[in-house]
Amino acid sequence: HGFAEFHRYFLTELDYDGLIVDVRFNGGGHVSPLLLSKLARKRIGYSLTRWMGEGSYPDDSVAGPMITLTNEHAGSDGDIFSHSFKLMGLGKLIGRRTWGEVIGIWPRNSLVDGTLTTQPEFSFWFKDVGWGVENYGTDVDLEVNNLPKEHRKNIDTQLNKAIELIQKDVKK
C-alpha cells in the first residue's frame, strides 16, 4: 500500500513551501521509479483560469525544496530510492547511510514440502558509483542519529533536523 498512500497524500502536500519525504525503514519493493517521477517534476509556472483558479505547471509538481529522510534500515528499493533522490539532485538526503542491500531475489522455486526458495537474480548499477551501493549503501548529505535515549522520549532527532533544514531552505 506504499505507493497508494504516497499518491493519496502527495497531492495534498504539493503546495506547501517545502516537502519532507521519509523512507526510513523502507525494506524494498518496486515503487521508487513511480515516486521519483512525481518528485522530479519541478514547478516552473502556473496557469490561471477565469473560473477554476490557479494550477501548477507542470501539473502535480512540488512547490518548494525537498529533503529525504533515510536510515540504516532502508534497503533494496529503499537504497535505490535514497541513492536516486541524491543522484537526481532533488534535495538533501539526511539521516543515516542506507543498508546496502540492492540484490533482488525471485521466490519461484518450491521444494516438495512447500518451502519456497529464493536466490539472488537482480543487481543494480548507478552511473555515479557503478555497483557500489550493494554491500555499502548510500551516504547521506548530513548524518543525524536517533539515539535510544531520545527514542524512549519520543524525540525524533532526524525529523526535527529535517524540519529545521527545510525551514531554512524555504527562507532562501
Language-model segment annotations:
Residues 16, 46, 126-172:
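In a subset of proteins, long, contiguous C-terminal domains/tails are tracked
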Residues 1-112, 151-155, 164-169:
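Cleft-lining beta-strand/loop regions that shape enzyme active-site pockets
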Residues 90-151:
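C-terminal structured "cap/appendage" subdomains that terminate the fold
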